[in-house]
């Protein structure tokens, strides 16, 4: 309660201050930007061009110049400049981003292997040039040739495309101009960074204009890989977190007169990444024993060896083991790649290092074709958009920064396709007192191969793969999905008085979802005897003597099983291994807002709105009864103030927002032990007791989809800009969030066992509680240092975030994330030698701060992953390092 009183006090104080320094006249003038010297920022959050200071919701807006100076190269970087926004790649894939706005998140991935599929919609959507990017895959590309970028906070359930509960990111690229001209920019920097981008406007006739924008950038990974195997001679020196990106936007605009234009765009992109990885931080030792041995034996290859899926033997770290201790270091070269030995070496390499046997590479190719037509009919403007998007994506996810391969996830989405269309009509009436918008929206998508394959071999098997210690292969690659959405919406703003307006809007959405599921499991090596054992245990396996090949290694025999169960957790026979699921969901959502001009340049507002996210079908779940999840619903309340004023002659812009969100049926993923094909170490069933004692083989943690009943989120956002002098600009922005599950208990469905913590009521939604960013820009003006210069600008930008909120009950304290801050500096020289050329020097992460990306649940990862979140076990804490200090130079030529 205290923080709410403080925040309300801040708002009240700001309004009082504004009243004290503002003109006493009650006459309202809405456009005060020119009077204060502050730039007017135009946004399209309500489907029409408006001053951002006049829109009654929280918005962050940027142009290309601002993004460049703040080093916002991709959507992921928006977390450093926009309050309440947090973006990071999923655990295994650089090309797939989890966008979080106001604590509402996308899934990391249904499988845990990095393939998000079409199972569930995003909580915070991304729209490029009006086209809805429904999937998180492919969002990691470079932002270039940007005209404007807007981040809308809170539910966008009325006007902005598909329903989103957290918010939306809208960005548009530049349209063709009517005169010839353009620019080219080249960049060189650390870690082999090299990039070039540019654009050119080409007027073809008096009414037909073209624009071509191209981008190519490449950078070597900043995490060095030191993997080598002295026994086999294998090695991997591929640095992680590197990328090679290409992109092109080809635009053609026809404008025969002032009332009509049509714009065609072809947006082509390709991305090849060297993959994410993990750095080992430290060892922690618990009290829970591992198969009756010392707890440290829970760490892979600490007390027992194995042969991995590459055929490389890994010997144990310790030679002498009993129920309480593990001693005597193993001198064998085969023990070189045990986890504990690898951990020790990584401490000597430094923070930005790993030893990963196989890189988590990914590659994607993306194409988007769109047409937007605008027609003016006097007081009415009509806009029609149609788009087609297709992409393919492939990759590999292997372990987590480990010097062996015991789980290999391969994914291939060869032919994703989506079609969408939207008609929007804007109008005004009653002498412009009433402004209205109405529209229709359609979207459909399909993916014929919506899954991947997971090869898994337990490190506690204590041997090479055999019919007694089998590899589990799970095949989701034959699954397919199709989703469609239809919506109609209308919204109007009416000026009750010259200084007071009311806005009301409604949207009705109807969603259809279909999935055809044919998941399979293969156990190999296998014999007729081991197959009969499965059958006797009620698992209808089909034996084949055909060898199964993994990474060029042939394993004798295989048992084929269906990876679907009935509602009671019994595996379906191969002859009936299919499930076609159709679901439909529908929901009305609304917006209601009241805004009032207190005085010139100062608006206060109150907005109430609802949001909805469609239910979904998890094609990688095993239990037919647990395949679907209900839709999410949110009820959001926001109050705020937007003010442009002068303080002792200094122009100031201050925007403040407070919000409260009631969140119902939250779609969440929980790591739950999958024991469908698992056995105890002695060959019996993998029971809850055996699992808790660490005595199961062929079990693995699976992400199942659930609906948490209720959560509540309180938060605040602020953005302040001040111009103390004509050569200094100061900006400060930030957010505070207090998100908690208020009712979240669950029982694992049949085929799974209960995790350590099944009651999450009262636990936080994992996000940073505080995020702040500050920017100072100094314009030294025109100078002459032997050659004439235009403006010389120095920009310093600092981002800070608190540690992640997380439920730490099942984790070691070393797995808690930590707060960090990063400082970026940039020096720009414009119009060098009056040639139209600009030059810039930059340095990011000046202090070389060591910082980590957390896991989906807000903690740092641990090895072994199957005990992730199990209290009292032993492990090695890991993290994905954020970039180190990087410097570079950039040159731009305008023509």
Each model region followed by its residue ranges:
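Gram-negative outer-membrane beta-barrel transporters
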Residues: 498-502, 655-662, 681-807, 890-892
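Periplasmic-side early beta-strands and strand-to-turn transitions of outer-membrane beta-barrels
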Residues: 178-179, 187, 201-305, 354, ...
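C-terminal beta-signal and adjacent terminal beta-strands/loops
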Residues: 662, 669, 727, 788, ...
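Structural signature of Gram-negative outer-membrane beta-barrels, strongest in the C-terminal barrel
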Residues: 253-255, 425-426, 435-443, 479-661
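Acidic, small-polar-rich N-terminal luminal/periplasmic segments of exported/outer-membrane proteins
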Residues: 38-178, 639
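Membrane-embedded beta-barrel scaffold of Gram-negative outer-membrane proteins
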Residues: 372, 376-377, 383-387, 392-397, ...
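Outer-membrane beta-barrel translocator/receptor signature
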Residues: 121-123, 135, 142-153, 158-248, ...
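N-terminal Sec signal peptide and the immediately downstream disordered periplasmic leader
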Residues: 1-80, 369, 685-690, 695
């Amino acid at each position: 309660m205290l923080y709410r009183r403080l925040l309300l006090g801040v708002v009240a104080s700001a309004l009082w201050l504004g009243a004290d320094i503002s003109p006493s006249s009650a006459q309202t003038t809405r456009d005060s930007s020119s009077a204060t010297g502050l730039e007017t920022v135009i946004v399209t959050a309500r489907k029409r061009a408006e001053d951002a200071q006049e829109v009654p919701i929280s918005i962050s807006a940027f142009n290309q110049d601002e993004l460049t100076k703040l080093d916002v190269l991709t959507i992921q970087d928006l977390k450093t400049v926009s309050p309440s926004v947090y973006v990071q790649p999923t655990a295994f894939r650089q090309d797939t981003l989890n966008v979080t706005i106001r604590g509402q998140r996308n899934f990391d991935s249904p499988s845990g292997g990095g393939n998000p599929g079409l199972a569930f919609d995003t909580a915070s959507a991304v729209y490029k040039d009006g086209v809805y990017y429904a999937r998180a895959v492919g969002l990691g590309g470079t932002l270039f040739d940007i005209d404007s970028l807007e981040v809308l906070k809170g539910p966008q359930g009325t006007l902005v495309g598909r329903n989103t509960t957290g918010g939306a990111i809208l960005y548009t690229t530049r349209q063709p101009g009517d005169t010839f001209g353009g620019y080219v920019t080249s960049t060189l920097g650390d870690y082999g960074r090299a990039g070039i981008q540019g654009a050119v406007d080409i007027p073809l006739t008096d009414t037909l204009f073209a624009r071509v924008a191209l981008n190519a950038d490449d950078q070597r990974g900043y995490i060095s890989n030191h993997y080598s195997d002295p026994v086999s001679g294998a090695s991997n020196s591929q640095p992680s977190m590197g990328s090679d990106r290409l992109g092109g936007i080809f635009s053609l605009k026809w404008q025969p007169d002032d009332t009509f234009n049509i714009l065609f765009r072809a947006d082509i992109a390709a991305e090849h990444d060297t993959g994410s990885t993990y750095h080992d931080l430290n060892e922690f030792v618990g009290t829970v024993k591992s198969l009756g041995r010392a707890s440290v034996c829970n760490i892979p290859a600490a007390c027992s060896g194995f042969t991995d899926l590459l055929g490389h033997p890994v010997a144990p770290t310790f030679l002498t083991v009993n129920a309480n201790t593990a001693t005597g270091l193993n001198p064998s070269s085969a023990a070189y790649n045990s986890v504990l030995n690898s951990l020790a070496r990584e401490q000597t390499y430094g923070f930005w290092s790993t030893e990963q046997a196989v890189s988590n590479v990914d590659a994607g190719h993306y194409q988007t074709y769109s047409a937007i037509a605008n027609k003016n009919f006097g007081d009415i403007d009509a806009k029609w958009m149609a788009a087609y998007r297709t992409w393919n994506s492939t990759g590999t996810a292997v372990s987590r920064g480990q010097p062996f391969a015991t789980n290999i996830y391969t994914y291939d989405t060869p032919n994703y396709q989506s079609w969408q269309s939207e008609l929007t009509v804007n109008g005004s009436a009653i002498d412009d007192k009433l402004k209205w918008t109405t529209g229709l929206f359609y979207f459909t998508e399909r993916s014929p191969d919506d899954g991947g394959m997971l090869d898994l071999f337990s490190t506690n098997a204590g041997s090479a793969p055999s019919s007694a210690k089998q590899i589990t292969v799970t095949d989701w690659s034959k699954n397919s999905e199709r989703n469609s959405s239809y919506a109609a919406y209308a919204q109007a703003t009416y000026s009750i008085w010259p200084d007071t307006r009311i806005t009301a809007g409604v949207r009705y959405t109807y969603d259809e979802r279909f999935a055809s599921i044919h998941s399979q499991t293969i156990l190999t090596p296998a014999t007729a005897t081991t197959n009969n054992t499965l059958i006797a245990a009620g698992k209808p396996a089909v034996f084949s003597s055909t060898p199964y090949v993994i990474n060029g290694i042939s394993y004798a025999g295989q048992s084929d099983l269906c990876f679907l169960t009935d509602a009671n957790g019994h595996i379906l026979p191969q002859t009936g291994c299919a499930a076609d699921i159709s679901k439909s969901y529908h929901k009305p959502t609304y917006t209601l807002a009241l805004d009032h001009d207190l005085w010139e340049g100062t608006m206060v507002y109150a907005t109430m709105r609802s949001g909805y996210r469609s239910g979904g079908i998890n094609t990688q779940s095993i239990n037919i009864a647990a395949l679907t999840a209900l839709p999410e619903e949110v009820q959001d309340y926001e109050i705020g103030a937007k003010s442009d004023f002068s303080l002792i002659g200094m122009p100031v812009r201050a925007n403040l927002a407070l919000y409260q969100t009631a969140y119902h049926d939250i779609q969440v993923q929980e790591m739950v032990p999958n024991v469908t094909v698992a056995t105890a170490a002695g060959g019996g069933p993998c029971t809850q007791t055996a699992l808790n004692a660490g005595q199961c083989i062929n079990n693995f943690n699976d992400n199942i989809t659930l609906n948490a009943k209720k959560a509540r989120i309180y938060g605040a956002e602020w953005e302040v800009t001040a111009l103390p002098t004509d050569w200094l600009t100061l900006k400060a922005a930030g957010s505070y969030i207090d998100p908690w599950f208020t009712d979240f208990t669950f029982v694992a469905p049949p085929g799974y066992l209960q995790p350590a913590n099944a009651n999450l009521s009262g636990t936080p939604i994992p996000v940073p509680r505080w995020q702040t960013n500050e920017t100072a820009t100094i314009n030294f003006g025109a100078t002459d240092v032997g050659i004439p210069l235009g403006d010389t600008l120095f920009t310093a930008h600092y981002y800070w975030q608190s540690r992640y909120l997380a439920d730490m009950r099942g984790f070691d304290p070393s797995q808690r994330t930590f707060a960090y801050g990063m400082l970026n500096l940039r020096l720009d020289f414009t119009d060098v030698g009056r040639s139209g050329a600009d030059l810039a020097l930059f340095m990011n992460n000046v202090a070389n701060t060591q910082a980590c990306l957390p896991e989906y649940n807000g903690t740092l990862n641990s090895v072994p992953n199957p005990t992730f979140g199990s209290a009292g076990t032993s492990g090695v804490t890991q993290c994905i390092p954020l970039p180190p200090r990087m410097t570079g130079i950039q040159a731009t030529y305008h023509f």
